[in-house]
Amino acid sequence: MAIKNEQKGICWIDWPEELKDRHSKAVKEAEKELAEEIEFYRFQQYCFTTQWRKLKAYANKKGISIIGDVPIYVALDSSDAWANPEMLQFDKDYDPKAVAGCPPDAFSATGQLWGNPLYDWKALKKDGYGWWVQRMTHCWNFMM
């Protein structure tokens, strides 16, 4: 978020090349320059996690289970897409080769085009679907 704010909110695929491609030097410089804002976001995440754990413990103590779902697709303009472009079907300029949607059905005569980039399952398989394992493990631990 800090870099996105610094870039006036534009999508990461339109950032300067050194940031878009996550060049180590540029990312380290951004971390240094934006350290205060980064710490603010870390603090927000800490506060949310602390409050979530208290709420969940209270609900569980009262016999209430809290469940949620995990979105299957990531947004084009997401930290997941920026940090892991190799797991998605992008061209050399990070434009999606294909996007998610669904065909016409009872809810939409024209179908739906969601715009989420599709996964590159061959690339994900190379490390045993590590991104998915990490994502599901985090969600499981967060809910349990």
Where is each model-derived feature located?
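Alpha-amylase-like alpha-glycosidases and glucanotransferases acting on alpha-linked glucans and related
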Residues: 1-53, 73-144
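Hydrophobic faces of well-ordered beta-strands that scaffold small-molecule active sites
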Residues: 66-68
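Anion (oxyanion) recognition and catalysis
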Residues: 60
